[in-house]
Regions:
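Residues embedded in well-ordered regular secondary structure
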Residues: 1-54, 141-144, 160-165
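Outer-membrane beta-barrel strand-turn architecture
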Residues: 28-29, 68-70, 162-168, 224-227
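Charge-patterned, long linear interaction tracts outside catalytic cores
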Residues: 157, 161, 168-174
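Surface-exposed loop/interface segments of Gram-negative outer-membrane beta-barrel transport/assembly proteins
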Residues: 1-3, 46-53, 59-155, 173-244
Length: 244
């Protein structure tokens, strides 16, 4: 039987789903208003399918504002949260990436066989008389896709604006930007050709980072007119603190 492997067809998967849902609620009165939204996005990768490359995002946002004492004082807040979870294939570069091997590997080389020394179901061309330089792009992709990334970000602020007299506005805003991310990966021992192998050691890696930025901004502005001229003045200060 002549082997005729369509490597491109093997790498790409049909019917990769994308799902997107959102819910928004808005309301208010003469002195108050609010806006709330929820969202979810899921996208399966067309290369390798959902078990190899998959993206999920959850997001939440809420904004409110209230006017007090006949608009003399205005207070409010903004808050948003985003959580992203994804797995993905190795991107590499123009010379070495997951898909490049699929374009150059011989169609006479099979995807699966029982000749792999590490009990992998994917074919190893090392001992082939003709194709030992060809790797197994599908086997490489499925073996090296053991990674998971989690990212979350929280942005929020509260503010107050005071107008003691007409055209004079004094405003104070305190905000925080918090982030946290984690990445985990696992690479087993493998061999797929004389050039594509990892026989040194199994490796596991985990990275984590988090931090936040706090910002406090205070401004005072006064608007007035002189004849046909409109003039705006403002003074302010801002303090920023970062930790991470």
């Amino acid at each position: 039987t002549v082997i005729d492997t369509d490597w491109i067809d093997q790498m790409f998967k049909d019917n990769a789903k994308t799902q997107s849902y959102s819910l928004g609620i808005n309301g208010g009165s003469a002195t108050s208003n609010y806006s709330i939204s929820l969202g979810y996005l899921s996208q399966e990768g067309i290369v390798g399918g959902k078990d190899v490359s998959n993206y999920e995002r959850y997001n939440f946002r809420i904004n409110t504002e209230h006017k007090l004492y006949k608009d003399v004082l205005k207070v409010g807040q903004h808050a948003s949260f985003v959580y992203v979870k994804n797995t993905g294939i190795g991107v590499g570069n123009q010379y070495n990436n997951t898909l490049r091997g699929a374009f150059s590997t011989s169609p006479l080389s099979p995807v699966y066989s029982d000749n792999n020394k590490y009990d992998s179901p994917y074919n190893d061309t090392t001992n082939s008389d003709w194709f030992n330089v060809d790797s197994n792009p599908y086997g490489v992709m499925m073996t090296n896709n053991n990674n998971l990334s989690d990212n979350q970000k929280w942005i929020a602020d509260v503010y107050a604006e005071f107008q003691p007299i007409k055209n004079l506005k004094i405003k104070s805003v305190f905000g925080i930007n918090y982030y946290a991310s984690e990445y985990r990966s696992y690479t087993p021992l493998y061999r797929f050709s004389i050039y594509s192998y990892n026989e040194a050691h199994t490796s596991v890696s985990q990275n984590m980072s988090k931090g936040h930025t706090m910002t406090w901004t205070n401004t005072a502005g006064y608007d007035f007119n002189i004849n046909d001229h409109a003039i705006s003045t403002m003074i302010g200060m801002e303090a920023v603190r970062f930790q991470g």
